[in-house]
Amino acid sequence: IMCTEAKARAFRPSDAELEGDTDAATKYVGVSKKYEATFPNIEMNTVPHLKLVQFIESAIRESEPDIVITHHPADTNNDHLQTSMACQEAIRLFQRQPTVKPVKEFWYMEVPSCSEWAINDAMNLFRPNCYVEVGQNGIQAKCKALSMYRGVMRPYPHPRSVEYITGLAAMRGSQWGCNYAEAFQVVLRRY
C-alpha cells in the first residue's frame, strides 16, 4: 500500500515526486510489479476497513504470493495497525474464493522508528522468530533504496538513519550467526 498524502512529514514531496521516488526505489531493489492505492497517511483509520481488505485481496489474487509480509500490529503508527489488520483478513481470501491460491506464510516485519516503541502491548510485542541473511551488500542496498524517498532518512541516532539500520541488521545477524540479517515474526505457516 502506498500513501500519497504524507501530511505529517517535515518535508512533503509532491505526489509526482513521491511517485518518482517509489518508482526509483522499487526499480533499484528489483521489484517488477507494485500495487498502489491512495489511502490518506496518518488517517487510514478513516478509510472503511473493507476497502483496505479488498485492495490487498486484489493484489493477492493477481500476484499469488507464497508469503505476505506486513507491519506488526503493535507498531506505534496507526496506519501500520490498520494495514496489519486488513492483511490478516485478506490472507483468508482463499476461504471465501476457493479458486484463489492460499498464502503459505504470513510474516510481520520490523520497522525502525515504529516497532521498537511497542507501546500497544495489548497486541503483544514484535518477537522475531525468522531471520533472513541479507549480507553487507543487502543492507547497503536497503539504505540506498530508503534514501531514494525524500525526507525519510534522518541523521543518527534516529532509527531511520544508515547507522541505526546497519547496526540493527548487524545485531539481528549476530543473533542468527551471520553478519547482517533482517528479522521477522512468522505468525502463520501452512504446508
Regions found by a protein language model. Give the residues of each.
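A charged helix-plus-loop insertion that forms the helical arch/lid used to bind
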Residues: 14-19
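ATP-dependent adenylation/pyrophosphate-handling site
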Residues: 1-13
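Metal-dependent de-N-acetylase/amidase catalytic core
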Residues: 12-13, 42, 46-191
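Conserved SAM-binding loop
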Residues: 22-25
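A conserved beta-strand->alpha-helix junction
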Residues: 1-2, 27-40
